[in-house]
């Protein structure tokens, strides 16, 4: 699916999304109920080791055969049953998501209701990529402010950090929350440079160092005043607990696909809530399928910071859900329809589909 504009980060440029969807049919008595999952892997293994073609391969060759031998498949079984296969959390998450969606539809209940979410809407932030010029960046940010987004996140990298942040802070003023995301672009030796961002009163700096460098993040947290938030580093509840314990993680970005699914995402939320660590829900340029589920998840009480759950139109001119995600007065509604909170626009999906593969027991 083409993006409405190129989205550049420190690891590359996205102009379209090659999206892998999973559709399952679960038997409930005499009926079949469908469920949908969205794999958040990118086309290339740049954000993480996973990529779309690889995710499809591992699903077909290794993951689905292990699920098919079960007498009945439940969302709670997916992670345990697939634990013998190392890695591939995004592929596993897409399968769990599809099964969970089907289970909830069969029970005629919503994900938000099962989670006990009480709020009716969540604040919406927007992620702004690296631009060709400061003028282009400022025009984009002003447009998002005009659209009502309550928090701005800027992608940064060496050579595109201090000046863009200074210019954007001047544009939006001191009261609008502003944060930056480095996507692992810096090294331990960059602490003095990153401390120059402190004067801009940032909400956080996200994943400044490589994902495996928890100690480096802990040391950086002592060098700068801006809170350090982890993204790529947090792959499970266990790793999250370790990161918090060593002082590497003052704030957590929870992405269900990155951690293996929504059930693990809830466990991470619960641990962070108990530890007093604020969390927010990150984005992977999802369609309305993933955005709806994320909006329900982000209604949990530990999600105290605005996430990257923006409107469908932030990235796509035409979404593949019947009711695209909208931002109204800076808020996204928490979906309450059965399942994960969306219905498929089959005409739009058919128009965007490039190939199909069917796997059966």
Where are these regions (language model features)?
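N-terminal capping/lid subdomain adjacent to the active-site entrance of alpha/beta enzymes
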Residues: 1-179, 183-188, 192, 198-199, ...
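A short glycine-rich beta-strand->turn/loop micro-motif centered on a GG-aromatic cluster
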Residues: 63, 208-209, 281
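Residue-level marker of alpha-helix boundaries and capping positions
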Residues: 90-91, 131, 207-208, 259, ...
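Catalytic beta/alpha-barrel core
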Residues: 150-158, 179-184, 201-212, 227-235, ...
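Shared catalytic-loop signature of beta/alpha-barrel
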Residues: 212-229, 234-331
């Amino acid at each position: 699916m083409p993006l409405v504009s190129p989205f550049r980060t420190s690891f590359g440029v996205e102009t379209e999304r090659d999206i892998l969807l999973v559709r399952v049919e679960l038997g409930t008595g005499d009926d079949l109920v469908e469920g949908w999952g969205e794999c958040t892997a990118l086309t290339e293994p740049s954000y993480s080791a996973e990529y779309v073609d690889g995710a499809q391969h591992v699903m077909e060759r290794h993951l689905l055969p292990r699920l098919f031998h079960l007498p009945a498949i439940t969302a709670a079984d997916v992670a345990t049953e697939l634990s013998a296969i190392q890695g591939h959390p995004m592929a596993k998450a897409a399968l769990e998501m599809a099964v969970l969606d089907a289970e909830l539809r069969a029970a005629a209940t919503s994900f938000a209701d099962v989670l006990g979410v009480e709020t009716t809407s969540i604040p919406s932030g927007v992620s702004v990529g690296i631009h060709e010029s400061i003028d282009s960046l400022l025009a984009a940010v002003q447009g998002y402010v005009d659209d009502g987004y309550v928090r701005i996140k800027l992608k940064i990298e060496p050579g595109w950090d201090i000046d863009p942040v200074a210019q954007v802070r001047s544009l939006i003023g001191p009261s609008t929350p502003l944060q930056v995301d480095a996507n692992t672009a810096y090294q331990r030796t960059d602490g003095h440079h990153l401390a120059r961002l402190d004067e801009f009163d940032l909400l956080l700096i996200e994943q400044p160092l490589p994902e495996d460098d928890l100690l480096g993040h802990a040391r950086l947290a002592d060098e700068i005043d801006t809170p350090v938030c982890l993204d790529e580093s947090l792959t499970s509840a266990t790793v999250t607990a370790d990161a918090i314990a060593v002082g590497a993680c003052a704030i957590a970005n929870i992405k269900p696909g990155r951690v293996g699914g929504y059930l693990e995402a809830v466990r991470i939320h619960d641990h962070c809530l108990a530890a007093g660590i604020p969390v927010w829900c990150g984005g992977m340029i999802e369609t309305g399928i993933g955005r709806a589920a994320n909006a329900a998840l982000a209604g949990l009480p530990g999600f105290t910071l605005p996430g990257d759950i923006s409107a469908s139109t932030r990235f796509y001119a035409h979404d593949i859900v019947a009711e695209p995600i909208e931002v109204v007065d800076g808020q996204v509604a928490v979906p309450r329809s059965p399942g994960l909170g969306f219905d498929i626009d089959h005409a739009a999906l058919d128009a965007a589909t490039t190939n199909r593969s069917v796997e059966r027991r």
